[in-house]
């Protein structure tokens, strides 16, 4: 896979370009330049470690939005056996910005629900760039209630720039659909684990984000409004987005300190897009371990703790 490098990764891109040039020269001329290639690879690894050890919140926002970052569909394909996608909300239609269905995680039946941005231009349009409409959240709700009936745990994968704010979305009750999901998820009698895999923005993320565990991948973000939106409101210019990202505390490390996030799951060096298979295996292992803990707990105690957790959001005294 040819990687797209972000602005702050350009020194890495230069080194990787030299490595590729030397590899081509070695192939064409049968020259033994493996030692030089190994030296440059080691240098590139150290440079990547150095850059990624001190990322700013705004740089982490960029990594979370990386065009090659794995989406929900990528994780589902790698983590779940016997996957069977389910469609429609039984009220209006099938929103492709939300994908959901039944699969097996290490043999255990689970209901998986994820927000999906789409990879190609055509797919991005079909999936509305990962911005669900009311029918998407109602589809998610239908699948969660089905999971409760069949005693299957629910796993959600959060990755959205936000719920779709268009007129048609408002006409069909986007606010009500989000609120209904919050209410039902808070009392759903089955374990729920939520994981932010990319962008977790506003009510669009929270609508499938109420659970017993909330994980964030290391370079994912979670916020009430995008840094650009915040900057535009407060400073009247998007150029202040880096400052807004810093002030809002959008990263997993800050949110874990605040008690909003339970666990940060480490990503491969350079981000999840550098090694999707390794990231998927790591996430699969951790979700399986968390499910083992949750299914062993008393359901009433689980629900009480889940509800208290939801009510504590935004409470400075919690």
Swiss-Prot record:
Q: What class of enzyme is it?
A: transferase
Reply yes or no: does the keyword ATP-binding apply.
Answer: yes
Q: Which residues form the CoA carboxyltransferase C-terminal domain?
A: 36-293
Alphabetically sorted, this entry's keywords are: ATP-binding, Cytoplasm, Fatty acid biosynthesis, Fatty acid metabolism, Lipid biosynthesis, Lipid metabolism, Nucleotide-binding, Transferase
A GO biological process of this protein is: malonyl-CoA biosynthetic process
Q: Which pathway or pathways does this protein act in?
A: Lipid metabolism; malonyl-CoA biosynthesis; malonyl-CoA from acetyl-CoA: step 1/1
Q: Name one GO cellular component term.
A: acetyl-CoA carboxylase complex
Cellular location of this protein?
Cytoplasm
**GO MF, one annotated term:** ATP binding
Its Enzyme Commission number?
2.1.3.15
In its keyword annotation, does this UniProt entry include Lipid metabolism? yes
Q: Which reaction does it catalyse?
A: N(6)-carboxybiotinyl-L-lysyl-[protein] + acetyl-CoA = N(6)-biotinyl-L-lysyl-[protein] + malonyl-CoA
Give the Pfam families listed for this entry.
ACCA
Q: Which family does it belong to?
A: Belongs to the AccA family.
Q: What does this protein do?
A: Component of the acetyl coenzyme A carboxylase (ACC) complex. First, biotin carboxylase catalyzes the carboxylation of biotin on its carrier protein (BCCP) and then the CO(2) group is transferred by the carboxyltransferase to acetyl-CoA to form malonyl-CoA.
Question: Could you give the subunit structure recorded for this chain?
Answer: Acetyl-CoA carboxylase is a heterohexamer composed of biotin carboxyl carrier protein (AccB), biotin carboxylase (AccC) and two subunits each of ACCase subunit alpha (AccA) and ACCase subunit beta (AccD).
NCBIfam families according to UniProt = accA, AccA_sub, PRK05724.1
- In its UniProt entry, what is this protein called? Acetyl-coenzyme A carboxylase carboxyl transferase subunit alpha
- Source organism per UniProt: Teredinibacter turnerae (strain ATCC 39867 / T7901)
